[in-house]
Amino acid sequence: MRLNTVVLADDAAENIGELCVMLKDSTQQLLEQLDRTRNDIQINNAIYCHDAVNKQNLSEKVAVVNSNNFLCCWYGHGTDTSFCMNGEDVVTTVENHYVFSNALVYTFSCQNGGTLADVLIDNNAKAFVGYSGNANCPYGIDDVTCGIAMSFLSSFFDGKVLDDAVDDLKSSYEDAVFNKDLEPFQRLWFQENRDNVVLKGDASLTINDLLVA
């Protein structure tokens, strides 16, 4: 069985480019770990940074896998109606949303869990996990932010249903909120992240549901 994945990481994103690279690399590491522990899974992972994807070619890139179920991760800036790469809205409520039919979309991006997520689900995305408001990344602790964000993928790859994996993500934020080694403002930002986490679509989805022959 094969797991098809697409990672969109805006390494040129203002203020968060380095975090997006860290998220991309950590996602790749988790996929490699999954490949080692699950002998029945072949990983087919495509990674696109700011210089490889734009509004015009995104559908062509994703069309390679979107006839079947797949995982797609977005790391960059967002709004209620768009996801941005290199200053360009590459996914919006009127453009390119349709290419994510059959996808579990996982994002670390602001506000994509609002109207854009609804449009994705209406266009047959399997599920969406992201943020209805800000996805904060406190300055100077990108490693902490990345670790929290990856807790969702780690749990999902371990076989947990989507709903439980999202609970683990919220628990990771909760741990940060009560971590006295962090500055008060950092803890408040992570609290906002926790409160903004949203799951839309099929909450019973598991990693096995994304596998294709």
Q: Which sequence ranges carry the predicted segments?
A:
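A domain-level signal for caspase-like cysteine endopeptidase catalytic cores
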Residues: 1-71, 75, 107
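Short amphipathic alpha-helical segments and helix-helix/interface helices
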Residues: 27-31, 59-63, 90-97, 117-121
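Local beta-strand N-terminus motif with an aromatic residue
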Residues: 68-69, 102, 125
